[in-house]
Amino acid sequence: DKIPGQVTASALEERGMQAMISAWYAPQGDLISNEEVKGWVDEYPEQFYGMCSVDLRDPVQAVKVIRQAVQQDGFKAVRIVQWLWELPCSHALYYPVLATCVELDVPICLQVGHTGPLRSSETGRPAHIERIALDFPDLKIVCGHIGYPWHVEMICVATKFPNVYIDTSAYKVKRYPAELVQYMKSNGKQKVMFGTNFPMIMPDAALEGFEQLGLDDETAQLFLAGNAERVFKL
């Protein structure tokens, strides 16, 4: 069953949080439509920002959808879940989407690392992120789910390219790899963003043990809010 927008908005409001909420499109159709996301954002503008998604099989229509979502409906990013399509982000079908993100100056949000469902993890390898970062140097790329078991490679890609970022969605604090925490404390303090993967992980559970990371005040603020505010222009 779908989680009602009111439940999500209330959970965020109680904790003084805001969230990006994403549409999901797959070959079988929309799992969460752009229209649903727009409805939630319109109803709870203090809690939600929208991310649109598209059908990769129709690149011309995908470009039209993105332009409307960003220019008319105020969406802040585009999200594609690569394993749903069984195509890495370096595949040609993504390129009209990526070019449109550059044109409109909005980030593309992708998943890196292994897949939870029984689907190939090949689409989540950071090498595909490197390929599109080379081809689209002005494209802002937000890589969700940390990238495990290739998280060190993901950190290298984020370090190499100024517009590549990592978010921690789907991981509780206690599961953050040590290499990621060290990156956050050093040259990666402006490159890592907090995420939850709500409702799979609730905000309180995602942040449990946060103080044990030992982040200074500046780094903690950037991680929890500042980096996302800057990259997504919130």
Regions found by a protein language model. Give the residues of each.
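Structural recognition of alpha->loop->beta junctions
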Residues: Q71-K76, A127-C143, F161-D167
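Active-site gating/metal-coordination segments in enzymes
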Residues: Q18, P27-L110, H114-T123, K174
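Helix C-cap/helix->beta junction micro-motif
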Residues: R15, Y44, E103-L104, F136-P137, ...
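Conserved, mostly hydrophobic/aromatic
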Residues: L12, V37, V41, A69, ...
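Active-site-adjacent C-terminal substructures of enzyme catalytic domains
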Residues: K140, G147-A206, Q212-E218
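Mid-to-C-terminal alpha-helical segments outside catalytic/metal-binding sites
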Residues: D1-Q18, R67-Q68, S186-M193, I201-L234
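Hydrophobic faces of well-ordered beta-strands that scaffold small-molecule active sites
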Residues: A19-S22, Y49-C52, K76-I80, I108-L110, ...
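A general structural detector for well-ordered alpha-helical segments in enzyme core domains, enriched
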Residues: V7-A11, S33-W40, V65-A69, L93-V97, ...
